[in-house]
A protein has these predicted regions:
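Conserved short histidine dyad/triad with adjacent acidic residue
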Residues: 64-90
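Conserved metal-binding segment of the jelly-roll/cupin
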Residues: 119-139
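A short beta-loop-beta micro-motif enriched in histidine and acidic residues
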Residues: 80-94, 112-113, 119-121
Length: 180
């Protein structure tokens, strides 16, 4: 995974929008974002490593989704736009990329800047509950992702706004990163 500050140039969300300013693992950790690279091997040993992380974080369920034009059909454009709306979740968001690639953009709270995390096969990302973020495919227009969940699979997005800013999960997140 490669992380960097996004440029502020308008344009296709699937383009890199690379400002040239790299982000260190320490900066990502300071905002609660964790990542690992677990190479995908033909024997399937990567599954054990991913499930080990899931167990450590008390995740019990997972599913696999494919995001591309073929799998989403007529809903492709609307789904992609929906994923790109700035939002947060009340649970951690854990994603492991099996095939393809895409971007998770996370807000750096102190500056309101976007940090773009370009993920590809073998990358595992954990976003803390309460962090504002969004997702976009890159120019490959396809990704296959394992989603991990504490309980039953669910994906409830709370789009950014005054009400969401006051959400207890959001306020707890902000407090947790201000302590550091």
């Amino acid at each position: 995974m490669r992380a960097y500050f996004m440029d502020d140039i308008p344009g296709d969300q699937r383009l890199p929008h690379d400002s040239g300013r790299e982000i260190s693992d320490d900066v990502l950790r300071s905002i609660g974002v964790l990542h690992w690279h677990i190479p995908i091997d033909g024997a399937g040993a990567y599954k054990d490593e991913v499930l080990k992380v899931a167990k450590e974080r008390e995740y019990k369920n997972h599913d696999v989704i494919v995001i591309n034009k073929e799998s989403l059909g007529d809903e492709f454009e609307s789904k992609i736009k929906n994923f790109y709306h700035e939002h947060m979740h009340e649970d951690e968001e854990i994603r492991y990329i099996l095939e393809g690639s895409g971007y998770f953009d996370v807000r750096e709270h102190a500056t309101e800047s976007w940090i773009r995390c370009h993920m590809s096969a073998g990358d595992l990302l954990v976003l803390p509950a309460g962090i504002y973020h969004r997702f976009s495919l890159d120019m490959t227009n396809r990704v296959q992702t394992m989603r991990l969940f504490k309980d039953e699979p669910k994906w409830i997005a709370h789009n950014r706004g005054k009400e969401t800013d006051a959400n207890p999960f959001r306020t707890q997140y902000v407090k947790s990163i201000e302590v550091q």
